[in-house]
Amino acid sequence: MKKTLLIKANGIANARKSGVISGVGRSTQKLLSALDKIEDIPFDIKVYVDGTSGIGFDFYGWKFPHSVFPVPVSWGNEKTSLEPWYRKHFMKYNLLHIPHNDDWVYKGEKFVVTMHDVFEYDVALAEGNQPVIRKWQTMAYDSVGIMTCSEYSKSEILKRFKIAEEKVSVVYWGTSTDVFYKNDEQETNEHLGRLGVKSPYFLSVSCAHPRKNIRILLKAYRMFKVLNEQQNCNKLILVWNNPPEDLMTEYAREIDDGSVVFLKSVSDKDLRALYCGATCTMFPTRSEGFGFPILESFACGTPIMTCRNTCLEEVGQDVALYVGEDNIDEMVRVMMQFEQGEYDMEKFERDSERIIDRFSWENTAREYINFYQKYL
């Protein structure tokens, strides 16, 4: 009889209202979609989600048996241990996978966890948030295995927790080429028209968290504007739901003249069009566990500027353009390189294809199968 893997896939149902799954939820959804396409998996897989958002959810038509624990998280996990208790005693499985950093488990459950990074744990330590600290420590010490998405993230996990190096495995995420690819020009223009965006422009898609470093990017863009005498130079488009008021006030002039544009959450189709139409994607982040925007931009045929830190060179390799996260002059030089037509797009197109081919969701799924088999 085959053994059974149970995956708690929280986050995959969030797109029903917004049309968007981001970050951890997106990686879980893409992993499961890739597993769904593999016929020779030597064990059974079951999937479930908790909370009311899963009620009526179709689980993307996956072949895996699926279920919903329809109790609000606050009651099922935070105020009681009802969900972990129910899972342990009534959901028949040999191994539980928690793919979203941390969760509640019942004593004696055999589980593996995917830790994407340690940002949330560091915040909890800084704030003295003991419930979150305990959850992370439970994940690190009580799991039978840990998966992460970059060598950098592995090194950070090992720094935070006293665990054996061999307990932590690394498998890179894939390029979502079913979502991000080169649009034809007409389709791109139709989407940009509906968004009110006109070319040429630089694009930044990951803005909300302070570590995304958008304040420095805006300072660099303002300097770029001062140095550039062309009226129709590249604008800066930022996908950002709720930019802070002080930033809106500080850059009111650029917002008023249309050179800086803030867009709220956009659909995947709109995001693809934004990538495809951009001159360059600007991703000046201070720290990442993986860095999806690099692969998304490459898949859409658009170069990316990012920073020489954390995992970013593992993903962007020798194809991304690297700057210091506080080096405004370097950022301006990259902007001017594109503005003056000095960037070699033909070389980029050849080299970026190599990156896209390497980061495959099928490869990711098969590596995860090996990981699961190790602990089943």
Predicted regions mapped to residue ranges:
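Carbohydrate transferase catalytic cores enriched for Leloir-type hexosyltransferases
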Residues: 1-376
